[in-house]
Amino acid sequence: MNDLKNNPKGNIKLLVLDIDGTIAGQSNQVRQPVLEAIKAAQAQGVLVAIATGRMYRSALRFHEKVGANLPLIAYQGAWIQDTVTNKRHFHQPVSVTLAAELLDYLEKPEFKSRLSIHFYINDELYVREIIGDTKEYALRSGIPPNAVGDLRVTLDPALDQSPTKILALSEDTKLIDELLVKVRQLYHPEELYLTKSVATFFEMAHPLVNKGLAVDYLVKKLLHITPEEVMTIGDNFNDVEMLQYAGIGVAMGDAPEEVKAIANWVAPSVEEDGVAEAINHFLL
């Protein structure tokens, strides 16, 4: 755990929250103690934003539930949209060429039957077929998938229609780890952003995308505050950049050890209302 920067109470102006594993646990809902703590922080003038790997439409109910009053950061930061005006401040998809390359790799014989692959285009979910992994995902996300057989039919260079994010799912966590290592060997960070949001999700996005860069957009383009005036809370590898960015970066209690190591503070787990504990500790 990193030493906390000099950040007295009252200094934080922006609180950025991840969804899954942070404000929403197994129930897929935000528990009352967490809601009350968020509202108490807002009553003291703290602004609240959501930063998630979820689709925009899937994240919207959480944004509304916590009364977030800033544009919603979705798709690991690849999509930033105002929920009131619907103005999209930022959208950076993967190129058509790169998406096709990645699909070729993920559909190699040694991987194809062991993976579900999701393409997210214009806030719609496209899959080859609807199987167990995808059914579970659809249930939690609240988004019905579009089964298209061959995902290549979704890629249209003429329209520059390409995925905001690509997700490979497998219950075989060793396979997900293996894929992460192998794809990192094929592409430099300047070419592709790679992360895991949970142990069974391998995610690919444009290299100029991560939650840290998205929070920086809110901070500098919209709010004109400093990183030291930001507190971020997350639970997995896709949260690392925003935890490092903020004056106070909080990891959840059941985060991977590598994520806890870069945080300034470790909260209890999501099922123990860790976000409420963190807000009470630092903001109230």
Predicted regions mapped to residue ranges:
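Mg2+-dependent phosphoryl-transfer enzymes with acidic/Ser/Thr/Gly-rich catalytic loops
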Residues: 4-14, 31, 203-284
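Asp-based phosphoryl-transfer active-site loop
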Residues: 11-27, 102
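Active-site metal-binding loops of divalent metal-dependent hydrolases
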Residues: 21, 54, 234-236
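Active-site phosphate-binding/coordination module
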Residues: 27-139
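Hydrophobic packing residues within well-ordered alpha-helices of enzyme cores
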Residues: 34, 59-63, 179, 183, ...
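Short, well-ordered alpha-helical microsegments
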Residues: 56-60, 176, 212, 239-240
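Short, structured coil segments at secondary-structure junctions
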Residues: 66-68, 75-76, 190, 245-246, ...
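Conserved acidic, metal-coordinating active-site core of Asp-based
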Residues: 109, 113-233
